[in-house]
Each structure stands twice: as structure tokens, then as C-alpha cells.
From Swiss-Prot:
One of its GO terms (cellular component) is cytosol. Its main location: cytoplasm. HAMAP family: Val_tRNA_synth_type1 (MF_02004). It is found in: Cytoplasm. Keywords: Aminoacyl-tRNA synthetase, ATP-binding, Coiled coil, Cytoplasm, Ligase, Nucleotide-binding, Protein biosynthesis. A motif ('HIGH' region) lies at residues 42-52. It catalyses: tRNA(Val) + L-valine + ATP = L-valyl-tRNA(Val) + AMP + diphosphate. GO terms for molecular function: aminoacyl-tRNA deacylase activity; ATP binding; valine-tRNA ligase activity. This is Valine--tRNA ligase.
Amino acid sequence: METKYNPQDIEQPLYEHWEKQGYFKPHGNTSKESFSIMIPPPNVTGSLHMGHAFQQTIMDTLIRYQRMQGKNTLWQAGTDHAGIATQMVVERKIAAEEGKTRHDYGRDAFIDKIWQWKGESGGNITNQMRRLGNSVDWERERFTMDEGLSNAVKEVFVRLYKEDLIYRGKRLVNWDPKLRTAISDLEVENRDVKGSMWHLRYPLADGVKTAEGKDYLVVATTRPETMLGDTGVAVNPEDPRYKDLIGKEVILPLIGRRIPIVGDEHADMEKGTGCVKITPAHDFNDYEVGKRHQLPMVNILTFDGDIRQSAEIFDTNGEASTACSSEIPEAFQGLERFAARKALVAAFDELGLLEEIKAHDLTVPYGDRGGVVIEPMLTDQWYVRAAVLAKPAVEAVEDGRIQFVPKQYENMYFSWMRDIQDWCISRQLWWGHRIPAWYDANGNVYVGRTEAEVRSENNLADDVVLNQDEDVLDTWFSSGLWTFSTLGWPEQTPDLKSFHPSSVMVSGFDIIFFWIARMIMLTMHFIKDEDGKPQVPFNTVYMTGLIRDEEGQKMSKSKGNVIDPLDMVDGISLEALLEKRTGNMMQPQLAEKIRKRTEKQFPNGIEPHGTDALRFTLAALASTGRDINWDMKRLEGYRNFCNKLWNASRFVLMNTEDQDCGFNGGEMELSLADRWILAEFNRTVKAYRDALDGYRFDIAANILYEFTWNQFCDWYLELTKPVMNGGSEAELRGTRHTLVTVLEALLRLAHPIIPFITETIWLRVKALKGINDDTIMLQPFPEFNAAQEDTLALNDLEWIKQAIIAVRNIRAEMNIAPGKPLEVLLRDATAEAQRRVEENLSFIQTLARLESITLLPAGDKGPVSVTKLIEGAELLIPMAGLIDKAAELDRLAKEVAKLEAEIGRIESKLSNEGFVARAPEAVVAKEREKMDGYAVAKTKLLEQQAVIAAL
């Protein structure tokens, strides 16, 4: 083996070998239990980020663990066509390179352009996934716009439409005026901004006056431009100021429209003036109020967000209405919405109807891709009736067919599902699954899988002109079918039978509604088991938190705190890292701040750590469902762990290769250390498997670390040296056999989390055990064996460790050189302690570096010594001649004086009332903590002084 562990040399060639050999494929033996995971499809436009690395490490750990248990294992990969994101990427590309828009190309040619882009750049993220060691069956890779998946999408749409679970309706949606499409709530970014609240006077009609004698009401609004579409004013029915006005009317200024005053609990008596203008066509809350009170909807905006020439009027069912005039004053027609705001406020002011303007903090919705303010817009869209689909999906979680890990996410799921709204599934884009609906010249709609099917089913002659709906489906609609469409549905394929329901879905909690819930609803509606019962898409949902930076901030380009997982694998220079973080920024003014922060955090760039260290860190930080603060020090620690495992393996190989390791017969005698490490490893296997079975990857990683570093490397390898240096043939054979047995099994145990280093070492170790197989990936996973429990060995060796640690502690406390041989006395030793010493003298003497161990006769107190209590005895080290008493007392006195000075400094700081009052609580607490630490250290030094003074 190479003397130095260098992940760069081993990882990529090994992965290419695995993929070429087909080790990632299911073995196909359907008599064995299946285990499958469908990867949450990343956007085809995307690059691998920390969230992907985190979730994929968890998935690959599970897949490798289950594969090693002999299961028929499938990890299905794929990418999402990502409607808006992909369309924008290609639009920007043709604008930059050719100065063209998609409209210059036309729909079909532009879509061809996107397919061309996907062919060139779409594989970027899957190549990055390979770098993580993901054991995905790449031959089955899917794309949400593949022909098979497109057929599944059409099938689902047509069936739902025929069951009256899809309909077309005019309702409010989040509208992006820049991209000119409806967008989902997930694509809306709510930003806190400092804005204004305008207080406007609306004159009361018919000479009516308020309780205070005023002939107007004052409404407060943050969006005065929408007043052109007002169709009511709401007051709280319990509000004594206005309850007598319910049923009366106000005159809408500038328009002259009479609109009713309605009593509705949406109006908050404590907020603003207590009067709320109602604009059902431009506000989600007002839309609901309008429905309750049968108010017409007046749409005043174009799809670009400009004021229309004349308004559109609809009733609460979305049908065209003549309930009020569609006139809009000429002065405002065609104005951009925010220009209209200024003009309207000025017009109110001129009429004396602007009561006041107050500064107001508010939350404004922005499109996360278009970057402009989102408008609630009344549009014709396609909807899924979600309540019908939600009922069985709720029951599946209630009765435990689907388990959430951690369990608390069930409540989040239930709260949304039990109050579910119909789902808007249409988008005004070109890239995506085009809606399989056609219209004739009279506006009649026909839904079918193809135009030919529509004509045939509806007996439409060839001369009847049909035009397909221009809209495409929401990306979440096609990804909602992911678990079964990727397995060949609507065909009843063998894969669907073998791998569905899938075993686990690993996902972020932020898409629990957008994706997880919709997968459950759609799968249960379309996939039935042999008894005709709805089938769930997966048995377990493992929810992850977000990965944040070291300060707990969300990673984002604008904060300049994004860490690319592959930069931690391969390393990156400071210069390249700065370019990555500050190049092509949407807000270049932030670049200097980001530069300074990056230079401070990574003065020398990022060192290469290798994939295994990254995976180990991600597993170790995976505490269930919580957000994770990334920690570079942990990454360094796990890189050191890999190094430790490498060096330990080299030690084992140096002592076992070309030696008799007892695998071909011959007498073997196991030492206590051999028996202990076998028993310790057996227990480790049980705890580790329990952790993985319970999705506690953090606990599993810590168990692996603790056993490998502390038990195997720091104790067992040291304990083999007395045998290696002077054992009999049988003892040597026993220890070599144990070294190889434990290392080989440990590599199998660690493989799911750290696949590259374990395979590399295993390929070298396997020959010693006579294994001829080509890969560790397909080796059996270690199993706990109750018959291998050896409590005596565990207890005896723990006692020996205790004795050795006691000697080492005395050396450290008394400043005795580590290499100086010591005499040890045992006082008042029980028979058990005496047995342990006699049977294991060589272990204790070698590891504690002792000249001798003497058992004192009963009643003999022994010379003046430093003592430590161990189980069943008192351990003494006589100090005579070991230390220079005067020099040691002098050294301790100086240490005590130094601590007293520090304690005094902090005491005076804490007695200063000004400091305590002004300093942040955390700073004061830190000072108190420091003082407590110094006090404990001082007490220990004084105890040592007393011992030495008595010598």
C-alpha cells in the first residue's frame, strides 16, 4: 500500500471501475427482498450543492448498506426538466450570444434549442453526482420529459379530467409579470421591506354619516393602485364604530362606482383604521371575502402588470359579468403598476381624499427567478381538485403505511393536507409537458392523449380546426409521478412489481407540500396493489434540514457563503474561490464584503479532503430533521480519520502479509486483547446497525469513529505489540488472525459511508482471508453474533485500560517524562485485581512503560506516593528520586500565581457594574465560565502541591 493516503489517486479510477462492472445494478433475483430509492430529481440546469451532497450521501449509505445485505437494490437517478429555470437559462444564452428572444425563434424552434442545450450541458449535475461515489444505476437514468414519462403525464391528466378531478377555472394565482406566467408558492420569495401605508378617504353614499359624524370612511392600504378594482369595503361586524354602516355604500373615488360596506371578520379592528378596501381580483384574502359576499371581481391589470384600457368584470364563478362598469379613467390607462401608484396617490391628494401616509414595514412577494414583485392575478388556469386526492393520502400517514422520520413532520403534513386548496397545474411557458387539451373555433375543449384520439373519441371531422392549449404543466405535476412513472407505468412492468412502493424518500422539509404530499396523492390514486388497494409511493420519508454556513446563515450567492462540495473534495485556491463567489453577481456592490469574509475564512483557499471525508462529515452532522451548521474543522477531523484508518491498515498488512494468519489451520491462541477486540467489534456491529436502521446516521458515524480510532487503533494495535515482540507461534497466529479478521470486517462495516478508502484497503486485505471476489460492495454486511459476547474479556480489558490511564495521568500531573520506566505498587488489591495483573502483566508493563508492578502485602501502606483509585485496588507510584521536589514546588507555585492573577482580573471585571450592564450577555457568561475553569485548575494544582510537599 502507498505510504500516504491520497484520495485524489484512488477515487475516480475506482468509481469508473465500479460503473463499468455494473455493480450498481439490481442483481435481479426477485425471490430476494427488494430495496429501492428514487432520487429526488435535481434540476437539469443545476450544479451539485451542499443540500444535494447531504441527501445523496444519506441515500447512498442506505443503498450500499442494503445491497450488502443481499437485497435486490435499485437506486434510480434522473433529472427534472425544471420549466422556468431551464427556459430562462436558454433565453439568457440566446440573448447573450445571438441578441435574440424566444419569440424570434418561435415555439418549436426554441424548444429544439432547449433540447440542444440539454444535450450539451444537461449532464453536468450527473457527472458531479458520480464524484460523490453515488452507486446509482446510470443505465436507468430518467428525465421528466423522456417519452415514457411524457406518456405517463398525459395518461394521468386525461384520467383525472375524465373523473372530473381536473377542471379549468378563473381564479387568483401568483403571477410573475416579467416571465408572464403563474408560479407556485415555492417560487415566491417573501422579502421584508420598508414601505408605506396610505390612508384614503372613501365618501359615504346617500348622505350617510359615521358614528363620529364623518361623511367618509378611511381605508388603509399598502397598494393604492389596486383601488381601481375595489368592489367593497369590509368592517368587522363587532366594531362599534362601523357596525351600523354594514349594508350601506361608499362612492369609489375617481371611478364613481357605488360599492357596499360588508361585515367580515377579515377586517381587524386593531389594524389600520378598521376599514379594509376589498379588491377580489388582486388580493388572495380579498378574493375569499369577495366570494363570501358575492362581490364582483374587477381585473385592472394586463399580464405585464400595466393598467388596462378597460377593466374585465367577472362574477365569483369567474364568468364574464356586467355587474359594474369596466371604465378606467384615461389618465391611468397603460401606466406601469408602480407609476400608476404614484399617479393615483397624487390624484387622491388633489381631491383632498389623502388622509395621511405612514411609514410601514411589510412583506412583499417577489418571484425568485424573475426578481420582480408578484401580482395576485385573475387568470384562466387548470386545477386539480385536491381534497378528494388528499383523503387517502392523510389516512396512509395516520395508519402508519407511510412513516415520517423524524415523526414531528407528520404534523406539518397533516396541517396542510387537512386544509388543502385546489392545485393550479398550468404554467404560461413553452418548455414543459404541454397540456393535452384542444379547442375548436367555438371554444369547446377536448381532452385526450393525442389529437387523433380526441378526433376519434368526439367524432370530429378532419376539417374541424383544433388548436392545442398553449400552456404547459407545472413541473411538480410530472415530478409527482416520479416513483412510478420512472418504472414504466402505465405499463404493468416487472420493475414496477419489484421496486414499488419504493423503500425510502429522502427530501428537504421545504418541499413536503409541493412534492412529497403530491406524490402520495397521485400515486395512491393511480397505483393499486394486487387486491386493488391504493399503493403508497414509499414506506418511509426521511426529512432533512438545511445546510447552513458556520454562523448558521442560509447559504446563498448574494451572501457569498456558498461552499461547493466538490471544492472540499478537490481543493480550490483562494483566487479561484473568490472568482467563484464574486463573479457574475446580481448585486456587485456586495463583492467587497464577500471578498473580505472569504479571505478571513479561507486565507489559503480550501485544501483537498477527498470524497470519503466529505461523506463522513455529512453523515456525522445528520442529526434528524435539524438544520446543520457546516463545520470545516469537522471535515478536517474526518480527513484525519481516513488517514488514521489508512495507517492502521498499513500496520496490519506489515505484520500479516506473507505471514501465517491462521486461515489455513494451525494452532491458534487468542490473547485477552484479541478476545476483547472481537467482542468489542461484535457490540459495535449491533449498535451501528441499530443506528442505520433507525436513520441515525450521526450516531452510526460516531460509533464507527469511536471504535476505529479509540478502540482499534489507539488500544488494540498497541496491545498487539507485546505478542508480536515475544509471543509463541500459536499466540502470533491468533493475533494475526484477529488483526485481519477485525480489519476486513471493519472495512465492510464502514463501506456504506466511506466507500473509496474501504474498497482500496479491502482489495489488499482480502487475499489474507482467501477471498477471491472483486469488490467489497457485494460482500455480506457484518452481523451481530450473540454467541461472540465475551463479557469477561470486555471487563478485564477495561480494567487494564483503567490501570494504564491512571499511570499516564500521574505522569502528566507530576511532569514525569513519558519514557521513564516507573515502579508501580498496588495496595489493598482484591483477588480479582490480583488475577488481572498476574494474567496480563506484559500488556500493562508495555503500555504503561513500567519497570515493575508489586502487590503490597495486606496492611502495608507503602512509601510516600502519588495514588489513583482503580476498581478493586489503589495504584501507587513512589515519588522518591523521580522528581526534583524543590523545582517542582517552585513550578507549581508559579502556575498557581498565574491562575490567581487571571482570576483576579476577571473578578474585577465582573464587579464593574458598567461592564456587566453594557456587555452582551454571552460575553459576561463567557468571562464567568473562564473564571470557573481557572478555579478548578487552581484547586488541582494545590492538591499536587500538597502531595509533593509531603514527599
